[in-house]
Structure formats: C-alpha cells, structure tokens
Design a protein with these regions (language model features):
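C-terminal lobe/tail of nucleotide-utilizing enzymes
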Residues: 1-4, 175-278
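Short, hinge-like loop/turn segments at secondary-structure boundaries
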Residues: 57-61, 151-153, 235-237
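Conserved catalytic-core segment of NTP-binding enzymes
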Residues: 115-218
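Conserved lysine of the Walker
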Residues: 21
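P-loop/Walker-type NTP enzyme "switch/lid" segment
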Residues: 9, 13-16, 31-110, 116, ...
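Generic structural signal for small/hydrophobic residues in well-ordered secondary structure
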Residues: 17, 50-51, 130, 220
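Active-site signature of alpha/beta-hydrolase-fold catalytic machinery across serine-
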Residues: 27, 31, 124
Length: 278
C-alpha cells in the first residue's frame, strides 16, 4: 500500500513539444489504475495543458455516457508570476513540493507531465524523478535533444543540453535520496520510414545510451487512434467500455500490446510479480 512504500514519481519529460508526452502520461496513468494502483498526476506543461484537457474530456465523456472510468487525482502547478527570479523560484519550489507531498499521502504513483523547454519547474520535476521517461520521435531531428552525433560515423560527439541537465539532476538527487533516477528513452512514432534510416537512428541511440546512461524502450507507433481518443478523454485501455463509438481493430490490439511492453520495460519495482491486467 502507499503507506508502506513512498509513492514512485514518474516524470515524462522532453525539451520539445510534439513527442506525445501527454499520450504517454495518460496511458500510463490508466494502465496503473487498471492494475489497482492509486495514481496522482501533476500537469506542469503550463502552456499547453494537454494532460489537463485530456482529463477534462474524460470527465465530460463519463457525464454524458454515465460510464465509470478510473480517474487519477490531478493537481495543477502554475508558474510563478513574480518578477524577482529568486522569489519566483522559491514560490515554484513551494507549490511543486507541496503538491507532490499531498499526492504522496494518497497515491502509489505520481505521474508528472513535464513542460516543454528548460524551465525551473522542469528541473524541479527532473530532480524529483524516480523514473524519467523521455519520448522521442524516431528521427535524427529529435535525436539532437539527446546528443550531437556525427552523421557519417554515428559516433557521439557530445551530450546535448538536455542530457547534461538530466546528468546534473541525477547527481543532485543522489545526494538526497537512495533512489537513483532510472532514465528510459522511448522511440515513439516509429513511422514506416525507410528501414535504413530507422536502423541508423537505432544504432546512434544505442551508442548514446551507453555513453550517457539511459535504457531504450520501443515507444508508441504513429497511429491515428491515439489522436481519435483525445476528444473523448479515452485511452486504448478503455475501449472495452460501453458507449465508446470507436470500433476495436487489429491496430488497437497492437497498440495495447505496446503499452504492456512499455510497462514490462519500465521495471517498476512496485509492480514486481503483478499480472498486467489490461
């Protein structure tokens, strides 16, 4: 139960938008709730608030259909409007830590949807992560987020700004906590791009993972179904519910399997020995 073991903090973070962070956060929340866990979410994406909108759509859908779906507890943390930087940072620290503390009382897992860009709130989230998931679009353009790579030899020239930031958060966290940050990079939207190019991205990522210490996970494919589910606030794991007018197809089955694979790869200690129930 949540009392015996402190809630695990999972941060879904990436400097860019558009890599499907909210889709991952939402599906992970529902997967954990379907496994009987209590989940709290914090939406730090101050600009887009996609996760908050996703959950609002979910509530609306339940009201209109009368269906009961698992809902996480959601907390919004706003950026400070203080002009003075020190004051702003201390206000944000206060807001963030009190939200985490509140959710830790009631939850087994806290999922934090990180903001795009390098902000103080984003760093706070990363320093507090037990598991960090970075969704990455499967292309060399997004690859820049992690490191600078020689396009000919695929040799890693230097880690990126984001990788350096994660590294410094890891060092900081190691001073205060016995839980190291387990960093997982997800290759999302593995479009049917030319196999050769895909292999090269894979090779470069493998080189980089050894160098800067993350684990690689296959991500979620580019499927229209994820986009179709957003307006109803549904996830793939809800599609058996009555009233969802989405017809269940083979691609839904495949996508649901991707979620199971992700959960297995995350190796969350709290789920050891548990059956995957979705």
């Amino acid at each position: 139960s949540a009392q015996q073991r402190e809630a695990r903090v999972i941060v879904v973070g990436n400097e860019k938008g558009g890599a499907g962070k909210s889709t991952v956060s939402m599906h992970l929340s529902v997967a954990l709730m379907r496994m009987g866990k209590k989940v709290g979410v914090i939406d730090l994406d101050v600009r887009q608030r996609s996760l908050t909108r996703y959950l609002e759509n979910r509530l609306r859908w339940m009201q209109s259909t009368g269906a009961k779906l698992p809902m996480p507890e959601i907390v919004r943390v706003d950026a400070s409007t203080e002009r003075d930087l020190d004051k702003a940072e201390s206000e944000e620290t206060q807001r963030f830590l009190s939200s985490v503390a509140r959710l830790k009382k009631a939850c087994d897992f806290i999922i934090i949807d990180g903001p795009g860009g390098d902000t103080y709130l984003s760093r706070l989230a990363h320093v507090n992560a037990d598991t960090l998931i970075t969704p990455l679009n499967d292309s060399f353009v997004d690859f820049d987020l992690l490191g600078d790579v020689n396009p000919q030899t695929l040799e890693v020239l230097r880690p990126s700004f984001y990788s350096e930031m994660v590294w410094s958060c890891r060092k900081k966290k190691a001073q205060t906590s016995r839980r190291p940050i387990d960093w997982i990079v997800m290759r999302n939207r593995m479009s049917p791009l030319a196999a050769r190019n895909k292999e090269r991205v894979g090779e470069a990522l493998t080189n980089l993972s050894k160098r800067i210490g993350f684990r690689l996970a296959p991500g979620l494919s580019e499927r229209v179904i994820y986009r179709e589910l957003f307006p109803a606030g549904l996830t793939l794991l809800d599609l058996t519910e009555k009233g969802s007018n989405v017809s269940f197809t083979m691609s839904h089955v495949a996508a649901r399997q991707e979620m199971r694979d992700l959960l297995i790869i995350l190796q969350l200690p709290e789920l050891v020995g548990a059956e995957i129930e979705f």
